[in-house]
Swiss-Prot record:
Its EC number is 2.2.1.2. It holds the Pfam family TAL_FSA. GO terms for molecular function: transaldolase activity. One of its GO terms (cellular component) is cytoplasm. It catalyses: D-sedoheptulose 7-phosphate + D-glyceraldehyde 3-phosphate = D-erythrose 4-phosphate + beta-D-fructose 6-phosphate. It is an enzyme of class 2 (transferase). This is Transaldolase. Pathway: Carbohydrate degradation; pentose phosphate pathway; D-glyceraldehyde 3-phosphate and beta-D-fructose 6-phosphate from D-ribose 5-phosphate and D-xylulose 5-phosphate (non-oxidative stage): step 2/3. Keywords: Cytoplasm, Pentose shunt, Schiff base, Transferase. The gene is tal. CDD domains: Transaldolase_TalAB.
Length: 319
């Protein structure tokens, strides 16, 4: 009998969600994703600290933003030596509400990758799913820079990303689950709210169904998992990005994995189309307390980790 990881691969592209590229080798993911928190975690390990020190030393005196991007690209290049597919590298979360600055930073990251001999087709630029971020992605896609819209918690964000023609979205399963569990308090029933009844799983399933019903080409990559049950309940999603710990657990567990998500049947009723435009986006997002709160919280967390990464680079003598 196959492992659950092997069985999952029959339905879904498996992506490693980590900056720890050495851990990836045994798990053989197709793609990999990184973010400021994962890179910060990696460079605090003895195995990866020399990479930070080398980048800081080689580019001492350059603007701190450039040195940070060079560190992200250094990790990305190492990852691309391991995975056959793509790596996602994130634009500084401090630019989440600045369309022009996001575009400029994304261009800079792609230029660094291309200067290192990496084709832009192997890189996804991660951008927070704010209105400003989505508009930046719209223009970047037109330039051939493929984007991964992250910190996505709602169908309204997903619909705006589809309309903008982005390459891929990353709806966050675990953080949606966290919000609903906290909101329910003592009324939360873990057994009843697991698997296909998990609110995070249901959110991704709705987005997936909406995209497939309307023929949206944007890829859906479920992210931010708390347990393997959430992962297995989304078998059939275009991609799933999974932490090394949960990948190892799937690899160590035997069992078939049934298909959970699939294309709609011919003639199936279309879900209600969401209105487009900035006013509708901001209004509908504002009405969704969970999505509004988790988007703001996610940006704050990534900004905090970006600042801590800056501090490490300064301590290493980069600036």
């Amino acid at each position: 009998m196959p492992s659950q990881l092997e069985a999952l691969r029959r339905h879904t592209t498996v992506v490693a969600d980590t900056g720890d590229f050495e851990t990836m080798r045994a798990l053989r993911p197709t793609d990999a994703t990184t973010n400021p928190s994962l890179i910060l975690k990696a460079v605090q390990q003895a195995a990866y600290r020399p990479l930070l020190d080398q980048v800081a030393r080689d580019h001492r005196g350059a603007p701190l933003a450039e040195i940070t991007d060079r560190l992200l690209v250094a990790f990305g290049r190492q990852i691309l030596d391991i995975v056959p597919g793509r790596v996602s590298t994130e634009v500084d979360a401090r630019l989440s509400f600045d369309t022009r600055a996001t575009i400029e930073r994304a261009r800079s990251l792609i230029a660094l990758y291309e200067a290192a001999g990496v084709a832009r087709e192997r890189v996804l630029i991660k951008i927070a799913s704010t209105w400003e971020g989505i508009q930046a992605a719209r223009l970047l896609q037109q330039e051939g820079i493929r984007c991964n819209l992250t910190l996505l918690f709602s169908l309204v964000q997903a619909a705006a990303c589809a309309e903008a023609g982005v390459q891929l979205i990353s709806p966050f399963v675990g953080r949606i689950y966290d919000w609903h569990k906290k909101a329910a308090g003592a009324q939360w029933n873990e057994a009843q709210q697991s698997g296909v009844n998990d609110p995070g799983v249901q959110s991704v399933a709705r987005i997936f169904a909406y995209y497939k019903a309307y023929g949206v080409a944007t890829e859906v990559m479920g992210a931010s998992f708390r347990n393997t049950g959430q992962i297995l309940a989304l078998a059939g999603c275009d991609l799933l990005t999974i932490s090394p710990e949960l990948l190892a657990r799937l690899d160590a567990t035997e069992g078939e994995v049934p298909l959970s998500l699939s294309e709609p049947l011919p003639g199936a009723a279309l879900p209600k189309a969401l209105p487009s435009g900035e006013i509708a986006f901001r209004s509908l997002l504002n009405e969704d307390a969970m999505a509004s709160e988790k988007l703001a919280e996610g940006i704050r967390l990534f900004v905090g980790d970006a600042q801590r990464l800056d501090d490490l680079l300064r301590a290493a003598g980069a600036y």
